[in-house]
Amino acid sequence: MSTSPSRRTLLATGSALGGALMIGGLPASAVARAADEEPVEVTASPDAWKDVLDDADMVWQRMPRTWYEGPYLGNGFLGSGIYAEPGAETRAVRFNVQHSEVQDHRPEFGSLFGLARLLIGHFTLEPVGTITGLDWRLGLQDAELTGTITTDRGTLTIRAFVHATRSVLAVEVMPSAGERDFRWVFHPADAISPRTAYVTPPAGYRGNPPAEVADHDGVMAAVQPLLAGGQHVTAWRDRTRGAGRTLYVSVAHSHPETTALDRALKEVRVDSEIPYNALAAPHRAWWHRFYRKSFLSLPDARFQRFYWIQLYKTASAARRDAPVMATSGPWLEPTPWPNTWWNLNAQLEYWLIHGSNHLELDAVTRALSEFRDNLAKAVAPQYRGDSLGIPRATDMKLVDIVSGFDYGVGVPGQSRPTPEVGNLTWALHNVWLSYRHTMDESILRDVLFPLLRKAINYYLHFLQPGSDGKLHLPATYSPEYGGNSRDCNYDLMLLTWGCRTLLESAELLGINDELAPRWREVLARRAPYPTDTNGFMIGADIPYAKSHRHYSHLLAVYPLYELTGHTPDERALIEKSLAHWVSFTGALQGYTFTGAASISALLGKGEDALRYLGQLMGRYIQANTMYKEAGPVIETPLSAAQSLHDMVCQSWGDVIRVFPALPGAWRDLVVHDFRTQGAFLLSAVREAGRTRWVRLVSEAGAPCVVRHGITGPIDVRDASGTSLAYEEATDGAIRVAIPKGGSVLITAQGDRPDLSIRPVGPNAPAPRWGMPAK
């Protein structure tokens, strides 16, 4: 990211770029304005989405027994994971009731206990007979579970969804004659931090009182009072229509008020008056619109299905106005991590929203802005006037307090609280990505710049010159490695990106900031990233010498793209560091392999990226594409979708790279309306191992440099078919001016390919996700 004052001017004007102006592969001066051709239009049939989504449906012909095997439904707030009732696998099916806003409110016990998300409870669907079989399908296109449960007394035909825009779970059951007396039973959970099952709680901590279940004029409700005040409420009604019954369930949470009961009862009363199909219609329409914002088809059937399931999962777990996803999204299960985690998880959870063109799910930008006052309270009192931070784990309002302190982010050079300082700057990189992919200046002006300024200011309090004349950081903590180190790479890399971004942002916003000289000084004088013969170290005092799942010591490579291998020495350093990182076994986890895949994609190594993702699939991803360690964690499969994005398109450094890291087996590939930095929508088709065409639509009129990957002379045309002037850049890229709302189409010279968007054929068959029959 350049900080030159003339950078935007240089990118926007051909006269200063030094490349020859071209039309149709010839100098513009030698070519008259090309005659208008037929308008060029990229077309996509709705069947394209239907085909890939139907193909990606998860199926179950065997009973799922855990959260990482069964179907899941959600809308960013309300969720339900579905599987056999433990200990009664042939007698009942569990429908969990989960909600991302339901948490405790006792900060004196810290975020992991006193502010933990709380289990709510579950329904059991209890047939008359013994369950002997099932046939379920989670239809991605409609976000709806359908199928049958077979017993020795008959069948239960079910349909279920969590409404996309209403706070209701609806489950319709059509029983055969022998199963007419099936029943629903609600089982409230203990309202206590799930972490208590793994770690001894602080002294004085106890669970909340039991829930109170009562009938409210035909609507049942389980009211869970909270010791801190407030309540969460599960309300439900089992409504009979004709031969079927529909269960309507809603959850509400309030603190410190006790208004949740009225809200939950009202939701159920309103929704239960609506027949299932009528209630489902707007829900299905929402999902159809959601998917059609982008398209990706690749010839590996297993990976293509996995990708579309991650989009389904993300839209089930996230909304802009919902809490930032906790470690398990809305689907809370027993876990030692019942909060939102900020030293990797939250960042990875939201990466895929950018390329897939789903910024409507960006809760990170909204939450950091809305709760910025709590970010000030996260640092020690003497720094709150000009600094911000975010602790490792927080509740939905970004609050955490470490026992014995009134703040959660440690002080560099001090051991307690743990000086894990870089988390907010890393989270703000997600905000920067949202700005860059939309070019929405309000994000830059109102959120990124003011928050990043104070996040970096926290570092500036502690930088000190050494005997070498460089600026050094006192000891800080690199997530999860163990031990504090001076000049920790996690922090130096984020500090460097932050200062560079602040300088560029100030220029774009026209701000003459008094701190700009200090930011420039940091870039000029900060200590070099500590390295040894094996590559990047954890910090100056700690080599990378044991198995470690995090890539926090490699952030300058990915995702910051501060180091990209643009020189042979830099490339060798990245390759050496990557190889050394993954060479230690024992503590590696799933996101180790997504990080390794994305770093490989940066280096253009598509085969390596595919190999790392293959290891992830074979060793870590579960039957329903969920992922587990000591408890459920959602970030790794979602970040694997981002690794696929990184293989298909990269747009760091003001260059759009089309198909930069595809493995040889992916000879056919289609991408449509893929969002890139600069607010471009990319559509491109690869056939028989070569790129046939590239189309870019500009939403902001930003400068456009694209490495299109088409061999030989090219034609560049606008939407009307008129040839456009362009300039040759470096490494096979061209520079072309696209006005806001305009588009360009790039093809081989004289080639007029079919511009339809349709799925590619698979190289080989693959089993569906879920639990199909063996």
Predicted regions and their residues:
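Carbohydrate-binding/catalytic loop surfaces
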Residues: S328-N339, R384-P412, K470-Y490, F536-H548, ...
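N-terminal export signals
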Residues: T9-V31
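Surface-exposed beta-strand/loop patches in extracellular or lumenal glycoproteins
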Residues: R180-A189, V697-T711
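Active-site core of glycosidic bond-cleaving carbohydrate-active enzymes
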Residues: W342-A378, G389-A393, S415-E441, D446, ...
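Secretory targeting signals
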Residues: M1-P5
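Carbohydrate-binding surface patches
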Residues: A164-V173, A679-V705
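Acidic/polar, glycine-enriched structural segments that form the non-catalytic walls/loops
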Residues: A35-Y68, L73, F77-T340, L359-D362, ...
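Acidic/histidine-rich catalytic neighborhood
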Residues: K454-S505
